[in-house]
């Protein structure tokens, strides 16, 4: 399994859309995504890269393993 590293925000947004999330709103420099069946929204900031801790937290919210995450990234 590859190590999680920061990725570009645009790439992470493509990943979120691929797994069925839609942009609900923006507040300041935060983008809030949602998908039916989630307990809480997925939040990312308007930074150039998404840090590892935000990726890991959002994968936990989405109930997606890191292996599945890397497989999806290869597909998109």
Regions found by a protein language model. Name each.
Residues 1-29, 34-76:
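Basic nucleic-acid-binding interfaces
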């Amino acid at each position: 399994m590859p190590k999680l590293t920061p990725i570009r925000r645009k790439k992470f947004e493509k990943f979120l859309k691929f797994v069925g999330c839609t942009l609900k709103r923006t507040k300041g420099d935060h983008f809030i995504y949602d998908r039916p069946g989630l307990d809480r929204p997925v939040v990312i900031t308007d930074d150039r890269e998404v840090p590892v801790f935000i990726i890991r937290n959002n994968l936990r919210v989405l109930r997606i393993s890191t292996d599945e995450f890397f497989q999806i990234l290869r597909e998109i």
